[in-house]
UniProtKB/Swiss-Prot annotation:
MF (Gene Ontology): oxidoreductase activity, acting on NAD(P)H, quinone or similar compound as acceptor
Catalytic activity: a ubiquinone + n Na(+)(in) + NADH + H(+) = a ubiquinol + n Na(+)(out) + NAD(+)
InterPro entries documented for this protein: NqrA, NQRA_2nd, NqrA_C_domain, NQRA_N
Assigned protein family: Belongs to the NqrA family.
Pfam families from the UniProt entry: NQRA_2nd, NQRA_N, NQRA_SLBB
Protein function: NQR complex catalyzes the reduction of ubiquinone-1 to ubiquinol by two successive reactions, coupled with the transport of Na(+) ions from the cytoplasm to the periplasm. NqrA to NqrE are probably involved in the second step, the conversion of ubisemiquinone to ubiquinol.
Name used for this protein in its record: Na(+)-translocating NADH-quinone reductase subunit A
Keywords: Ion transport, NAD, Sodium, Sodium transport, Translocase, Transport, Ubiquinone
Oligomeric and partner information: Composed of six subunits; NqrA, NqrB, NqrC, NqrD, NqrE and NqrF.
């Protein structure tokens, strides 16, 4: 199936790493296992500081669904269990042993029954890789998904491409074969053909995939790479019982690697990007999952209050300004550094704004059609919060036809029934990143949706499963 998306906005941000900018491998001293994505679920920590762990060792377990573990990606020693407000679990920090783990697993995918395969996924931390829609929560083992969507079309700013992720392996063919094994495992686990969404420029091993998966291509501006866009165009979610799972290309590689090679895939590709990072430092690295920023970035960056650190892309990533030793998030493959200006631009309201981004034609740049928007992004808000007046501008950049402003108003009044009727079942917080970015009213839509979905999932979805 060929999908063409017309709505959205391609952001060409300054600070992207060069496509040829690989700079070897970095073996970090510390890594963390990010537990923030599991906030809707109560977790039981299985380790204490001082414990020795190996790659694949259980670190935490779903309290309500025993036997589902979150596992360590590396060998090492647990040094800290970080908690936030109300003792909420944030991450488990591990002092990594040098080198790659040699812990061997032996699973024969062909001989495993579906029930046995589910137990392997739960035990080895593979089930924790899936996300569940509606409500964008960690996948629950009590649910049988109607569909599974595998995303190979992620086009968030600075995010490494599929080709970059294949650089982990000896050859592109080897990487794709591992991916095929991962797809086979998913198809067998759920008894269905998953949907694989890629772009036209990717050359997939279609002869190996066509019999076990539905293949689709998508073309269009950001956010055409969002799973919500794929689900909307291929098989819409129409009610809360329409459960679908989503998973990324990198996570499918982790699944295939365990079954084919017998080892936990503890490494990942990371893009160092952002206009606050010197051009010579903008590059791609091969490092351990959850690596500490201190091992990847120049040391002088951490003492500057004019730089904002983000784990992930600049639109949906996690702000790390209050963290003493920030580490990569669970699903993050980018470290973004943005300028944090301390002064305002003089007479900014009188300037023509030829190089400023505007969707409402506030600046001169809005009157000229340009295929791509080039901008030097920083953390300046360019104004204070104000009431929402023009609700139509959000629909111009939203890839799926939902009334953005009405959903936000329903969520702010905690009217979840109305929000679901308007389209909340189809969306995730990331779908509101671009409307938040271009919003003249400065409303933190991304945070509102994220917190609302978390609250609703805790009270209604998780406890009833």
């Amino acid at each position: 199936m060929k999908i063409v998306v017309s709505r959205g906005l391609d952001l060409s941000l300054k600070g992207a790493p060069k496509e040829s900018g690989f700079c070897g491998k970095v073996d970090p001293t510390y890594v963390s296992v990010d537990l923030r994505p599991f906030a809707p679920l109560p977790l039981e920590v299985k380790v204490t500081p001082g414990d020795q762990v190996t790659a694949g060792s259980p670190l935490a377990e779903y309290k309500l669904f025993s036997g589902v573990f979150i596992t360590s990606p590396v060998d090492g020693e647990v040094v800290e269990i970080r908690r936030g407000n109300k003792r909420a679990l944030l991450e488990i920090v591990i002092k990594k042993k040098p080198g790659i783990s040699q812990t061997k697993f032996s699973y024969d995918l062909q001989s495993l029954t579906q029930k046995d395969l589910l137990e392997v996924f739960k035990k080895e931390g593979l089930f924790a890789l899936f996300k569940q829609r509606p409500f964008d929560i960690p996948a629950l083992p009590t649910q049988s998904p109607r569909d599974v969507f595998i995303n190979l079309a992620d086009n968030r700013p600075f995010t490494p491409s599929v080709e970059k992720h294949l650089s982990l392996f000896s050859s592109k063919e080897d990487g794709y074969y591992i991916f095929v094994v991962g797809v086979q495992a998913i198809a067998k686990l759920f008894g269905l053909k998953p949907h694989i969404i890629s772009t036209d420029r990717l050359t997939l091993p279609t002869q190996d995939l066509v019999s076990i998966a539905h293949l689709h291509t998508i073309d269009g501006p950001f956010p055409s790479g969002s799973p919500s866009t794929h689900i909307h165009h291929i098989a819409r979610i129409r009610n809360e019982r329409d459960v679908v799972f989503t998973i990324s290309f990198q996570e499918v590689l982790s699944i295939g690697h365990l079954f084919l090679k017998g080892f936990v895939l503890g490494q990942q590709i990371v893009a160092l990007a952002g206009s606050a990072l010197p051009p010579s430092q903008r590059k791609y690295l091969i490092t351990a999952k959850g690596a500490s920023f201190f091992d990847l970035l120049p040391k002088d960056i951490f003492s500057s209050d004019e730089i904002t650190l983000i784990s992930g892309d600049p639109l949906t990533g996690r702000l790390c300004k209050k963290e003493e030793n920030p580490c990569l998030g669970m699903r993050d493959h980018t470290i973004t550094l943005l300028p944090n200006p301390k002064t305002r631009e003089s007479f900014s309201f009188l300037r023509l704004g030829w190089n400023k981004l505007t969707v409402t034609r506030t600046y001169l740049s809005g009157f000229f059609k340009r295929k791509r928007v080039f901008m030097d992004m920083d953390t300046n808000m360019h104004g204070e919060k104000r009431p929402i007046i023009d609700a139509e501008i959000y629909e111009r950049v939203s890839a799926i036809p939902v009334p953005v402003a009405l959903i936000i108003k329903a969520l702010e009044t905690q009217n979840f029934e109305e929000a679901c009727r308007l389209g909340l079942l189809e969306v995730a917080p990331e779908d509101f990143a671009l409307p938040t970015f271009i919003d003249p009213s400065k409303t933190e839509m991304f945070s509102i949706v994220k917190e609302s979905l978390l609250r609703y999932a805790k009270e209604n979805v998780v406890t009833s499963s």
